[in-house]
């Protein structure tokens, strides 16, 4: 099952209440699977990448292994960007002469030096257009022993933004659910799988993390009081507090782009419906009114539309509606089971999990419902896709190596990288870039 779907189903069975059992049987029943006309794109050629010549970083003065350590972080960031093919070269002693035959090639040099004052060290990074010999980026970053990784992430993102006009994702984080035994907790890690740390410590079931646009808060569902309630976790303070504890389901949170509203699923009226709850928790607006299940809401980048999953056609399908709940219409017309939609930050694509012959795979399609392309295949269940902030990557959970873990891939399905390994991990949610974060909470 889809990770939002499967995890919710298992959790609802534990809750063992009438409304939860109704929800589970309605949306997670196993019916016949229809044939589809979804294009399989997994064999397609990946987007063309630009050559990047990454020089060995120099060290000046007593800086120890920092140059090699920093370069290793930068190299991984450049590779994971999906933009560059990285080649290792030796550093230059002088500015290189222009070489028009190498149009599109970029050379990156770096030097670590002792710092002064509060900064123990300085990193001087340069990016050069090999064809013209012009310096595209020349910047110095102060750092200390504990901030080398984030300094390299910032440098790589600066290079990406300078060369492509689109900031990279190296400074972002991913929230997810990790299961150990019967306990499910919320965890957070760097985008590359490093610095994994546990967020909740409730010894219960925590599911469906969602990032606030300002990047220091998570919404999630927890069963720690018996009912599936929505809580908010302040990552700065390290504390959680209840947001929606209405009777029945309080699940599948998703923040509006301005942070003023949280879309979610509530069953307080006896049926699972999509609601908008104001960030101050004072106002709740019901958007759907059906005798079926509506769940998994996700906002468009403009905040004017909401995509969601509904089984109103007889099986789970992706629908879209205006933020007021009007103009509800079907998006997916291929396949008998489509769930967990996510709108790309650029707004032109969506991704979701689709079941074919009992197996879940990730589909990417145009936001208007056309051109569905299957980007995973022959690798276990692949579920809960979520876009990176630059729309170039998708993070997802997969059972391709046995138990579910978090993986990352390019938006065309290429360059798959495993990010987690301990426990069983699913429900990934990609956080905002620092420069995208809202300065003021909604």
Give the ranges of each region predicted by the language model.
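Short beta-strand->alpha-helix linker/helix-N-cap micro-motif
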Residues: 39-102, 107-108, 114
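Short loop/turn segments that connect beta-strands within beta-propeller blades
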Residues: 131, 190-194, 234-238, 278-282, ...
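Amphipathic beta-strand/beta-sheet edge segments enriched in Tyr/Trp
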Residues: 96-158
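Blade-level signature of beta-propeller repeat domains, shared across WD40, Kelch, NHL, RCC1
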Residues: 401-442
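Hydrophobic beta-strand positions that form the internal "hydrophobic ladder"
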Residues: 174, 218, 259-262, 303-307, ...
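Residue-level detector of Asp-centered blade-edge/turn motifs that repeat once per structural unit
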Residues: 168-170, 213-214, 257-258, 301-302, ...
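A flexible loop/linker signature enriched in serine peptidases of the S9 family
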Residues: 167, 178-185, 201-204, 221-230, ...
């Amino acid at each position: 099952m889809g990770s939002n779907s499967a995890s919710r189903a298992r959790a609802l069975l534990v809750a063992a209440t009438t409304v939860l059992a109704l929800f589970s049987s309605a949306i997670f029943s196993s019916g016949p699977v229809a044939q589809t006309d979804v294009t399989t794109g997994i064999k397609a050629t990946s987007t063309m990448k630009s050559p990047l010549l990454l020089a060995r970083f120099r060290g000046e003065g007593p800086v120890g292994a920092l140059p090699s350590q920093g370069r290793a972080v930068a190299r991984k960031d450049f590779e994971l960007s999906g933009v560059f093919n990285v080649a290792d070269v030796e550093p230059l002693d002088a500015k290189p002469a222009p070489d028009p035959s190498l149009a599109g090639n970029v050379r990156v040099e770096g030097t670590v030096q002792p710092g002064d004052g509060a900064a123990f060290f300085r990193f001087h990074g340069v990016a050069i257009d090999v064809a013209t010999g012009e310096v595209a980026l020349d910047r110095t970053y102060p750092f200390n022993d504990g901030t080398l990784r984030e300094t390299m992430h910032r440098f790589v993102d600066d290079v990406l933004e300078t060369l492509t006009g689109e900031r990279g994702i190296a400074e972002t984080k991913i929230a997810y659910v990790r299961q150990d035994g019967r306990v499910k907790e919320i965890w957070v890690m760097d985008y590359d799988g490093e610095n994994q740390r546990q967020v909740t410590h409730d010894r219960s079931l925590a599911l469906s993390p969602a990032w606030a646009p300002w990047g220091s808060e998570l919404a999630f569902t927890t069963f720690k009081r018996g009912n599936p309630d929505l809580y908010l976790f302040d990552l700065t303070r390290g504390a959680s507090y209840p947001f929606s504890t209405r009777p029945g389901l309080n699940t599948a949170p998703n923040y509006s782009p301005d942070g003023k509203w949280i879309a979610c699923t509530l069953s307080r009226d006896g049926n699972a419906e999509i609601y908008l709850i104001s960030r101050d928790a004072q106002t709740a607006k019901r958007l759907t009114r059906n005798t079926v299940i509506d769940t998994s809401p996700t906002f468009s980048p403009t905040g004017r539309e909401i995509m969601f999953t509904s089984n109103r056609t007889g099986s789970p399908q992706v629908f879209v509606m205006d933020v007021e709940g009007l103009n509800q219409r079907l998006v997916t017309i291929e396949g008998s089971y489509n769930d967990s939609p996510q709108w790309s930050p650029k707004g032109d694509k969506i991704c979701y999990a689709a079941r074919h012959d009992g197996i879940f795979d990730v589909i990417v399609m145009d936001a208007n419902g056309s051109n569905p392309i299957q980007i995973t295949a022959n690798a276990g269940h692949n579920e809960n896709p979520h876009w990176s902030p630059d729309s170039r990557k998708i993070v997802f959970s997969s059972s391709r190596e046995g138990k579910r873990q978090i993986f990352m891939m390019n938006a065309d399905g290429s360059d798959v990288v495993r990010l987690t390994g301990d426990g069983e991990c699913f429900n990934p949610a990609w956080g905002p870039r620092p420069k995208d974060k809202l300065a003021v909470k909604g």
